Amino acid sequence: ILTAILPIAVSKCSERSFAKPTVSTSDTPEKPKDSGEILCALTAGLYKNSYSAETLKAIAILMNTNYRANPDSFKANDFLYEENASGSIKDVYGEIKKAAESAKNKTLRKNSEALFVPYSETSNGTTYKNENYKYIHSVASPWDCYQTDFDANAECVGVSLSGIDYLCKNGYSAEEALLWYLPDFEIADD
């Protein structure tokens, strides 16, 4: 059924173009944090009001994988700790904690190895292969064109967060949504 819908979705994607909003986060705190707080802060750093609880869980699995695979790839503004949260994020930080808690022992793995998985807010309807991430394949992501921040010129390698959100809101589990974008991976319990 999905393949029958793809041509319609792809043609719709080419009709619209929107600017991407930016997301800002706070600096890391001065005192060291445990791994649960770090995972929660990374998940919160990517939070959007529109994300479902299942989307937050998928993001937490992705962040857990990436932090374990390459902790040095993160910058201070990638983290949003609870004490630095404000506004709507402060109000839902409990939900973010719950998502991070449910994902703290889960990682995406290929051939039993946790590998860094790149991600973007959205794609142009397809994710791309990249020389730096030879273990990532191109997949269709036609539902990205329904996002308000859709950019027909966006080049996404790996996972589209908007695509993950769309799938999770339409019945996919966090794990199923991630595996749509990463068909050669598995989700392992550590």
Predicted regions and their residues:
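Conserved, single-site charged/polar hotspot
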Residues: 1-190
